[in-house]
Curated annotation (Swiss-Prot):
Keywords: ATP-binding, Ligase, Nucleotide-binding, Purine biosynthesis. It catalyses: 5-amino-1-(5-phospho-D-ribosyl)imidazole-4-carboxylate + L-aspartate + ATP = (2S)-2-[5-amino-1-(5-phospho-beta-D-ribosyl)imidazole-4-carboxamido]succinate + ADP + phosphate + 2 H(+). The lineage of its organism: Archaea, Thermoproteota, Thermoprotei, Sulfolobales, Sulfolobaceae. This is Phosphoribosylaminoimidazole-succinocarboxamide synthase. Pfam families: SAICAR_synt. PANTHER family: MULTIFUNCTIONAL PROTEIN ADE2, SI:DKEY-6E2.2. The gene is purC. InterPro entries: SAICAR_synt/ADE2_N, SAICAR_synt_PurC, SAICAR_synth, SAICAR_synthetase, SAICAR_synthetase_CS.
């Protein structure tokens, strides 16, 4: 069956599939700095597709709806056709990344309660931080929808944090994207080491921060492989 490409981003391609579904193909591209840094990491697409599928199934088993339907092949998902919202939603358990640059918060500081932040998906503007007023003015979502997403993020965090902890890792933070399916808000995109920060008890990095910090591609790939192996064993 010939499929038509709908769109292509930095790390994934969306293809038409049927009336209610699309295909999401994971590429081997790895990027950082709003796409300013880019390489090809052979096998990364498969690793991220498999990791994402695993976590989507985990969330579904815990009553949290995602766009995941199944796998077409090892790097391509069949997913529900959502109207995606161009907002990245980040939940932080432990301080690292941009928040320690923006605010007087120390690296590694543990938050008493998780912090949820919204960012506009806009590489040219470097994904600016959004509040409820911005999102309403830009017609991205209303306050009630944003608060509902915050509730979903907290539920997702409960599931992911405890599961990941059981495998010997610590979930510092993660990013999700949402889309509309009728009047529902549903988790879309991916849940992989490109979109979460994972450490072990010795503060060893397993996620895309390795690439951001200049580690070689072999180290990045071996960490992605080890993480997937451990969570699925």
């Amino acid at each position: 069956m010939e499929v038509n490409k709908i769109s292509e981003g930095k790390t994934k391609i969306v293809y038409d599939f049927d009336k209610d579904h699309v295909l999401l193909e994971f590429k081997d591209d790895i990027t950082a700095g709003d796409g300013q840094k880019r390489d090809i990491l052979e096998g990364k697409g498969v690793l991220n597709a498999q990791t994402s599928a695993f976590f989507f199934r985990l969330l579904e088993r815990n009553g949290i709806e995602t766009h995941y339907v199944g796998m077409k092949d090892e790097r391509t998902m069949i997913v529900k056709k959502l109207k995606m919202i161009p907002v990245e939603v980040v939940l932080r358990n432990i301080a690292t990344g941009s928040i320690v640059k923006r605010l007087p918060i120390k690296e590694g500081e543990v938050f008493e309660s998780p912090i949820v932040e919204f960012f506009l998906k806009d590489d040219l503007r470097h994904d600016p931080l959004l509040n409820y007023y911005h999102m309403e003015h830009l017609k991205l979502m209303n306050r009630k929808e944003a608060q509902h997403i915050e509730d979903i993020m907290m539920k997702v965090n409960d599931v992911l944090f405890n599961f990941i902890k059981s495998k010997g890792f610590i979930l510092y933070d993660f990013k999700l994207e949402f889309g509309r399916l009728g009047d529902k808000l549903v988790i879309g995109d991916e849940i992989s080491l490109d979109s979460m920060r994972i450490r072990d008890g010795n503060s060893r990095i397993y996620d895309k921060d390795l690439y951001r910090k200049g580690y070689d591609l072999k180290t990045v790939k071996s960490s992605y492989e080890e993480f997937l192996k451990r969570i699925t064993s």
